[in-house]
Swiss-Prot record:
Gene name linked to the record: ecdK
Requisite cofactors: Fe(2+)
Keyword Transmembrane carried by entry: no
Fe2OG dioxygenase domain: residues covered: 178-294
Cofactor note: Binds 1 Fe(2+) ion per subunit.
Residues where 2-oxoglutarate binds: R285
GO-annotated molecular function: dioxygenase activity; metal ion binding
Pathway: Antifungal biosynthesis
Protein name: 2-oxoglutarate-dependent dioxygenase ecdK
Length: 332
């Protein structure tokens, strides 16, 4: 099982034939593995290096500066800084399935800290920023990266609708007044032995809460996706180019398509090259994840087009905000 690499220019500026071929390849990749890689999306190597530099600069801030914008834990969209181990993904996806139940893995710990923002114009759940003099230019850069990622992911939804032979706005039309989120992840260095003991992971197997995710990762390794041919196994997805994105299906797209497209189960753990090195230490790892999400009051029930006429929908009606609250509530 391998992850397809797609050239975004084939859809963004391609001919009608190229756009349809891109959409079909995207659908094939999502159907087979739940993941694709995306290149030539408009972010340069310099811009990607810059966002990772901001990642480092933010997490290098003194604890008291980060604590001043701490995320208020609970069942709501995350905003600001979450300390090491605050979020517990070991509670998610019992049995590796999309579920609103809480797993009983109450002794599992995450070895990561993260910083989350939503749309700049969000008045309901406002962003929390370091003071401008602390990190001059940080807020502007993050907001710009957010907006460009939003545009890319909306085009991917258009491509998917084209391949699935549904109206162009089937998915995109639910994203006006969106509630997308952007996250910086920092996984501090950690002894290999700590992870091998089985109580701590960089991030446990889980699916993402949104529609699709756009992930940029450094070259340290450790990202693994479920092998759908052998569901108890995971396969590494290493970075091959500094500008590539890993794109995966989230919960809401699985729900909208009535399970036709399945959310991609993934984890971050010890890279294969470091396994069985009990005395070794995993180096610091960084990533940047953009989570495309719909308007908060839009439904995340199965869309009627994907429900056969003689069957009931697999996923019940609830708003995107209610779904987010249920899922976020599980990890705290």
């Amino acid at each position: 099982m391998s992850v397809l690499t797609l050239d975004f220019t084939k859809f963004h500026s391609g001919s009608e034939v190229e756009r349809r071929a891109f959409g079909q390849a995207l659908l094939d990749g999502f159907t087979t593995t739940g993941f694709v890689k995306l290149i030539n999306h408009g972010f340069s190597k310099e811009e990607m290096a810059d966002i990772f530099n901001w990642n480092q600069r933010f997490f290098d801030l003194p604890i008291d500066r980060k604590a001043a914008i701490r995320n208020d834990e609970g069942p709501k969209p995350q905003r600001g800084w979450s300390s090491l181990g605050a979020e517990k993904t070991g509670f998610l996806n019992p049995g590796g399935k999309l579920s609103l139940a809480r797993a009983s893995n109450n002794d599992r710990q995450d070895a990561k800290e993260h910083f989350d923002i939503g749309p700049a114009e969000d008045e309901e759940f406002q962003n929390k920023w370091p003071e401008e003099q602390t990190l001059p230019g940080f807020q502007e850069t993050m907001n710009s990266y957010f907006d460009r990622s939003q545009a890319i992911t909306l085009e991917l939804l258009e491509a998917l609708a084209l391949a699935m032979d549904v109206p162009k706005d089937t998915f995109v039309g639910l994203c006006h007044g969106h509630a997308s989120e952007l996250r910086l992840n920092h996984y501090p260095s950690i002894p290999v032995k700590t992870i091998e003991e089985g109580k701590t992971n960089r991030i446990w197997p889980h699916t993402d809460f949104g529609i699709i995710t756009l992930l940029a990762q450094d070259d340290i390794g450790g990202l693994e996706i479920q092998d759908r041919n052998h569901p108890s196994d995971f396969l590494p997805v290493n970075r091959e180019d500094s500008t590539e994105f890993v794109v995966n299906i989230g919960d809401i797209l699985e729900r909208w398509t009535n399970g036709r497209l399945r959310a991609g189960l993934h984890q971050v753990t010890t890279p294969r090259s470091m396994q069985q090195k009990g005395n070794g230490t995993l180096p610091t790892r960084r990533s940047v994840a953009f989570f495309l999400k719909p308007h908060r009051q839009m439904s995340v029930a199965s869309i009627s087009h994907f429900v056969p006429g003689n069957q009931s929908p697999r996923y019940e009606d609830m708003t995107a905000l209610a779904y987010q609250q249920l899922r976020t509530g599980i990890v705290y």
